[in-house]
């Protein structure tokens, strides 16, 4: 099932018991965070606060608070089915030439579908049903969440920031948090390596002193939102990818103040510009690490137009110590990454980003080991293959007999198959998450690789241990007599 806009997804969730409407007046200042946090930790539904205190616009939170709802947003019934999305991305990233005539015929539908999914421009879009300019622009009228007691100001969290570099043929969609600075100003917190920041830097170089047009879409359709956090090939727009997943072209419209294209069914659109040198101190904010981050200067986004649907819905979230919504999103997208990594490294059996690791700071990978040093090759490849893993600080490599998603298994492998000196790889002065205050320098830190695989000749001079395994015939016999033993509530091994 596909969803053309956020509202149709809300209806679908409600019909399936995955959304709860809250009519009680709840304050966007701290109260929504506390409620959403409790519900997420209980694996509860998405929440629609219909009467936010001192505001007239409903607030939607916890939309992607379970892997199941992430899968539902992409038209799947189960998070494991998201591997199909990963297989599609793996194909689009590195399409294989046909192995013969039959293979070429089989691949035609996929190529044709990919080529036929450019966005569709529409007139009179829903997102421009209400238009506010000049003195009418007032961001304080939006029910923007103030998430934590130590946060400096309310924070826009789920906005899709739309930019375009002067030398690029396609737009970039990114999700960057934005601090409320005034009635018409937000601080655009994009790090220097992110797509929006790169587009802006390129624009300043090409057109020094000029204003850079930027648009932020709030409450886009769920597939487009998730497309912005998925490793879409650089040659393909997030709109085209969203259309491919939806099976229907993404509807877009021209912004009123510039040539940027925005999702036509979005709930709210913020249009404006970033001045060449206007910066402001951003933060502190409670973040996905579970700590308040440091402050730093980032560009100021001046909003000149606010357009929105009639009876618009404000989409929001909070970030905090895992589990939070980004962590749940990471659990679901984990399944997308597996086929992409396998495409490059077929020896990978499974891949896991534990949510306790703040979504991406630790990865555990199981492999079919084939030669000495193989684990180190895979860990280096994982760090460099996808930009999503640039900030992964720790990678643990285990053999295929170890379940990389089971900490008991992983800890057993680390403690029995590793020598701390021989099997630890340390790399200094690598890109690191700006929010990681444990690094010695902001944005620059080290990485650690742990080779917890069985060691081959050349990696050790000692005879390697043989794992203890029960005789299969004995196991089979005990299975057959288990009920007669009268041992209640014990598992069959």
From Swiss-Prot:
Entry's EC annotation: 4.1.1.98
Record has Cell membrane as a keyword: yes
UniProtKB keywords: Cell membrane, Decarboxylase, Flavoprotein, FMN, Lyase, Manganese, Membrane, Metal-binding, Ubiquinone biosynthesis
Localization per Swiss-Prot or TrEMBL: Cell membrane
GO CC annotation: cytosol; plasma membrane
Reactions this protein catalyses: a 4-hydroxy-3-(all-trans-polyprenyl)benzoate + H(+) = a 2-(all-trans-polyprenyl)phenol + CO2
Pathway: Cofactor biosynthesis; ubiquinone biosynthesis
Membrane topology: Peripheral membrane protein
EC class: lyase
SUPFAM superfamilies xrefs: FMN-binding split barrel, UbiD C-terminal domain-like
Pfam family, any one: UbiD
Active site: 287 (proton donor)
Co-factor(s): prenylated FMN; Mn(2+)
Regions that span the bilayer: none
Residue numbers binding prenylated FMN: 175-177, 189-191, 194-195
Family per similarity comment: Belongs to the UbiD family.
NCBIfam families, per database record: PRK10922.1, UbiD family decarboxylase
Quaternary structure and partners: Homohexamer.
Protein function: Catalyzes the decarboxylation of 3-octaprenyl-4-hydroxy benzoate to 2-octaprenylphenol, an intermediate step in ubiquinone biosynthesis.
The name this protein goes by in its record: 3-octaprenyl-4-hydroxybenzoate carboxy-lyase
Source organism of the structure: Shewanella baltica (strain OS155 / ATCC BAA-1091)
